[in-house]
Amino acid sequence: MVFAKALIGRKIQKNVRVEIEEGYIRKVEVTNERVQIPGILIPSFVDTHAHYLPYSLSLTRPRLDGIGDLKSALDFIAENVKKVPHNVIIMEGFDDSKWERSLTREDLDRITERPLVVRRVCGHKAVLNTSAIKILKERFGKIPNLNEETGLAVEDLPLALSKYFPPSEEEIEDAIIRAEDLLISMGIWVVGENASIRYLRKLVEMDRAGVLKIRWRVAVYFNQIDEAKEIIKYESENFRVVGIKEFLDGSVGARTAAFSRGYTDGGNGKLLKSDEELEKIMKTAESLNLGVWWHAIGDLAIDQALRVLKRSKKPEIHRIEHFEFPREEHYKMAADMGVKLSLQPNFVRRWGEIGGLYHRALGEVFFWGNRFRLLENLKANYAFGSDTMPPGPIYGLLGALHHPIKEERLGLEEALYRYTTAGAEIFGEREFGEIAPGKKALITIITEDFNP
């Protein structure tokens, strides 16, 4: 077949013939033949950091995506409470970054006496009504980082919502099926999933049954490492544990990301682990031939991540997730160490505009963040992922192409490379990730419309 354009290596070539046989690319050449397929042929998108399984589960619940003010959110919640048959009502996806204020326990108490939990899109913040707080205390006792007066929960409960309100086995399997269909529809054949133990077990079960369609490269949470020992040993084409996940800080939206300078509305966030705890996690990962996946958004967390990784004899096997607001020296340090970085350009588009959430919350620190051009110039080992906020690469590509700081924008070839080949390389994949003879034909076609 002759394609109008194709990403070959790091460059887009015109009029490219690609021959595929038995699932492998056999021949690639520039030709003068008539174009048969428009658009741009690219290697499969690789979403290096995602939460498609809990996201797919959340699609069975009322979602507040796109609701731009508090009143509309409360109206939506009140209307949808009536539609949820379960005793505990869980709603997902609110983004209060442009509201006059966030939700409170009292807001939710006025809507229903049934237990109600509403989780923010970042996953680091949730608001509960009195009934939900009561049922949690009865089942689990005191919940860490839950303010019973305001109903605000950060980090522990929202991040582990499925531990407190566990889905059924059928719901988990349905979430995996739904996630794969969604991924394929977006041209993603390889995903780096942050997966809790029940999802891991179900993925392995479904892989053994031969029903998985895409390649899952997953990180297990450190607090579940003992339960995951046997799963870590399991490996196939479509499933492999590649990392151990731990949080060093939280999110900007929840005001829990850790910064050396304070938020404009107060507080600095805090580090969640000591250096000694992180070194133990790193050594555990290395003993299992895995890398760490360290969530680090604020400069204090990034500084800690790099400081501890310096103690490793092989820092290049490890990853820092998000790496959003490093100080200038952190960019060079990460590049020099060869540390893998998974960045989310969709955050730039969603919250990174001048006057947006990041700018309002961080002031001048905003300008430290997501410096893609600097990373290119330093030849850093980085790739893109979505964190499923929202899912899919196209939204994020626009964040890289139309970065609010013009000097940090990427060109189309660079951005596509970071969402395809660079992602495969970060996972250590050699069989696919390029449009080249001998490579597995994991490919997709995109249009050329990348207007903001």
Where are these regions (language model features)?
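A cytosolic small-molecule/anion-sensing beta-strand core signal
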Residues: 21, 248, 439
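Short, small/polar residue-rich loop motifs at catalytic or cofactor-binding pockets
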Residues: 11-14, 239-240, 428
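His/Asp/Glu-enriched, well-ordered alpha-helical/loop segment
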Residues: 284-293, 300-302, 306-318, 323, ...
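Non-cysteine beta-strand/loop elements that form the S-adenosyl-L-methionine
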Residues: 51, 239-256, 339-349, 386
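Acidic (Asp/Glu)-rich catalytic clusters
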Residues: 207-210, 231-239, 286-287, 313, ...
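Short, glycine-/Ser/Thr-/acidic-enriched flexible segments
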Residues: 25, 96, 123, 133, ...
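Phosphate/diphosphate-binding loops
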Residues: 214-245, 317-324, 359-376
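Divalent metal-binding segments
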Residues: 2, 6-21, 25-212, 216-226, ...
